[in-house]
């Protein structure tokens, strides 16, 4: 789920007292996850912060990180979902890293919720290759042997989402029709759905339309 359009929502709602729209966007998340529960969705990945977002003003970044920290606390406090942080944690401030590292599975059932924070698809693949090469070096293998033996399965084992199924459906709000690098490796066979609504205005009916659109498609893997 690419939660896009917060800032444009704020510009179109000047009386909302939310200059960047991030608080309004965060307030939608628990409601959305309830819809996912009702639809029996098993795994959800929410893109909260991209690596490119760090190019914004420090004031906006600090405000956004604070909201993300509060949102993670709220999600964990419900006790309804297993929350996992995925992304380049080293780019985040120490206080947020500590909070995210403290997240532990609390349920054997329920929706698995990935919060993609400081996430970039290219960065994820680079990190996966680095970790694979480090494993091979620790096992005493040469660089040449490690490169020769590298497979797609090896990279998948070191992705941030390792052990989880690839997404079947990717939804982006705000009308933008691009992925921006979201789940770049995992989405090779995913279906896409683009919704015109800004994320804070995203409704249950919009979600159901996305699911309905997906349900009537004939998925063609490998083409």
Name each model-derived stretch.
Residues 1-223:
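Flexible, compositionally biased loop and terminal segments
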């Amino acid at each position: 789920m690419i939660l896009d359009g917060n800032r444009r929502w704020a510009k179109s709602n000047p009386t909302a007292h939310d200059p960047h729209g991030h608080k309004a966007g965060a307030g939608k998340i628990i409601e959305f996850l309830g819809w996912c529960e009702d639809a029996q969705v098993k795994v959800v990945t929410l893109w909260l912060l991209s690596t490119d977002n760090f190019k914004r003003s420090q004031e906006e970044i600090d405000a956004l990180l604070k909201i993300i920290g509060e949102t993670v606390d709220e999600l964990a406090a419900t006790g309804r979902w297993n929350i996992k942080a995925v992304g380049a944690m080293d780019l985040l401030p120490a206080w947020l890293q500590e909070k995210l590292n403290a997240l532990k599975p609390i349920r054997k059932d329920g929706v698995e919720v990935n919060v993609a924070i400081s996430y970039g698809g290219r960065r994820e693949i680079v990190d996966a290759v680095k970790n694979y090469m480090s494993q091979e070096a620790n096992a005493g293998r040469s660089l040449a042997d490690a490169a020769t033996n590298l497979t797609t399965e090896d990279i998948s084992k070191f992705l941030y989402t390792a052990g989880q199924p690839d997404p079947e459906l990717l939804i982006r709000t705000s009308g933008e029709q691009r992925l921006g690098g979201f789940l770049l490796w995992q989405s090779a066979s995913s279906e896409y759905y683009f919704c015109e609504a800004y994320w804070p205005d995203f409704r249950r009916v919009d979600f159901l339309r996305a699911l309905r659109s997906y349900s009537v498609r004939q998925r063609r893997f490998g083409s």
